[in-house]
């Protein structure tokens, strides 16, 4: 198993790096050049930089990921593609994307886009909380323990 992180806006990178390096599972952070950092990463953690295009990180992750790799993303489109490839896919708020829930998530995203396109407003996501982080940590640890 390898872990790939859609890292541009991922608030749980620290959890992923800490927990994965403890069990020696390699982590690849995929992020745009606009988030470039000279910060040194622990052993077993690699950062891949991609162009700042809308889906550049998603495409790179899909090139790299193999069946049974673990991907962390908040992007439903990437999650859908990764599930089809046989990957395990987690959201940073602590839930697992599945073939049972991805269709509903994509449908909700589409309907919200249509509402916005018509000039109306939609509610954004709720703020990320410490409880969300701990929920993610518990789920992540259970996924990498296998």
UniProtKB/Swiss-Prot annotation:
Organism of origin: Bacillus cereus (strain G9842)
HAMAP family, per database record: UPF0178
Cross-referenced Pfam families: DUF188
Family, similarity comment: Belongs to the UPF0178 family.
InterPro entries found in the cross-reference section: UPF0178
Coiled coil: none
Protein name, entry field: UPF0178 protein BCG9842_B2187
Signal peptide (from-to): none
């Amino acid at each position: 198993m390898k872990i790939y992180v859609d890292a541009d806006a991922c608030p749980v990178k620290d959890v992923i790096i800490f927990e994965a390096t403890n069990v020696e599972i390699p982590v690849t952070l995929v992020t745009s050049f606009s988030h470039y950092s000279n910060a040194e990463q622990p052993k077993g953690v690699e950062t891949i930089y991609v162009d700042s295009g809308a889906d550049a990180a998603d495409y790179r992750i899909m090139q790299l990921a193999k069946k049974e790799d673990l991907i962390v993303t908040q992007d439903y489109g990437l999650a859908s593609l990764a599930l089809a490839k046989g990957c395990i896919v987690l959201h940073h708020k602590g839930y697992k994307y599945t073939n049972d829930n991805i269709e509903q998530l994509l449908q909700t995203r589409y309907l919200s886009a249509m509402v916005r396109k018509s000039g109306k407003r939609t509610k954004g996501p709720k703020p990320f909380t410490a409880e969300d982080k701990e929920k993610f940590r518990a789920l992540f640890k259970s996924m990498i323990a296998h």
